[in-house]
Amino acid sequence: IHLDIRGNLLLFLSIFCLLISLTSWSYHSMLDISVYGNFLIFIVTFGLFIVWELKTHHPIIDLRLFKNISFSSSIFAIFVFGGTTSLGFIIPPYVLETINHLSSWQIGLVNLTSPLGLVLTSKIAGKLISCISNIILMTIGLVIMIAAYTNLGLLQYILNPITISLLLLLYGIGGGFFLPSNTSAIMGTVSQDMQGTVGATQRMVQNIGIAFYTAVTSLFINHSSNSDKLLEGSSHAWLFASLTLFLALLPFSVKLLKHKFFEEKYDSK
């Protein structure tokens, strides 16, 4: 077994410095050395990681795979999905405890709604993959998730715990359509002997997304003990997540539109 120790160390150091930089930013000015210093280290080490991975015979993942648009867009989408899903577990406890004065077990029930929605629809999506393309299912899932988080962001000031639960459930339903089709799309872009490695990479990217969005969320809601500031920070965090979901949606939308255009052009002939 060949372990890419140098690649792992460079990746760990780069992500670690990025997270430290984002976390420090929530406490200090951008001009503080702990913010820009760690960010510069992140850029250098991540650049070295890319150079090393392209050079070594046993990389963590073959970076040439990212030349395939289907693969790279699906990997970016799982990064965003991992991060935005983490918001559903981070923000509600702050809001529900500070604003609505809910107890821990009640907050726990609200947080369960998103995973519940994912479980309810993931099995259905798994069966639909055989008759509907992965891109369509991912698009449906992303649109549903964008709708849920946009409503959470725009209506955060007037939402009650039940409405928050329903919107998180809606997000989970979208996630249930997205996740199985995303896994299938990623696996479909590589050969069978690469699927184990790519599956591990998908999970790694998802976890990096969780860590990244957790650090970013702290920028929005840190030092927000005041109710109005907490609601404002939470609203911005939901909308930021919704915007990144929209960015993840764009490549799939373009591909669907191109496919529809060529179909219509072919039919007209």
Regions picked out by a protein language model, each given a short descriptive name:
Residues N8, I33-I41, H58-F262:
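12-transmembrane solute porter fold
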